[in-house]
Amino acid sequence: MSDSATCSKSYQEFVKFGKFFTTRLVQALVQSRLGQLIVQSCSVSPDPTDWFSVRIDELGEVAAQLRTSVTKYPPNTNCFTLDFLLHTADGDVLPLESWCVRYESQLTDGNVNVRTELYHQLGTLLKSAIVASRMTPAYRYYVRKQSPDTFIIMYRVYEKEPEMDLGEEQKKVRIGLVTSPFGGFSVDLLYRTKMEIDR
């Protein structure tokens, strides 16, 4: 196999990993905002369908939303954003969080093997995001208290930089960054710290 064919195959894997990482991240984060306990058994022999060695049971509604709303995933778009918003029974809306997956073309590392190292690093980044999703103010204050009579947390996805105003004293945290010969993927979290609805 020629070097160009190997490079082309590695790039195809890079693109595929970017898409599957992003869709798994959305599934995991949306499920973390449902307020339901998620129990998964450990397995010595992982199922090959468990991308990045993380068992995530897909929600059909989320998969359908991604199919209808998203045409490109990183690296084919520079930024993919997942927003969470609190909707009250009175019709008020409080933007809570924006999760961003970015493709950073300038962050290359020719020594990284896409199939093994990048795949493993994306798995670690996915697990880090899952843990971080349970440490935010939105999770602590609202996720387990949702009810149709008070408020519910909704989400939206789009292929550009975050658009929400998260109020004064919003915070930004870089969850992680992984590099490859074709560029890097990063995950950033922006979140609200003042839980007040503007009137």
Sequence positions of predicted segments:
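Long protein-protein interaction modules used by eukaryotic assembly/scaffold proteins
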Residues: M1-R199
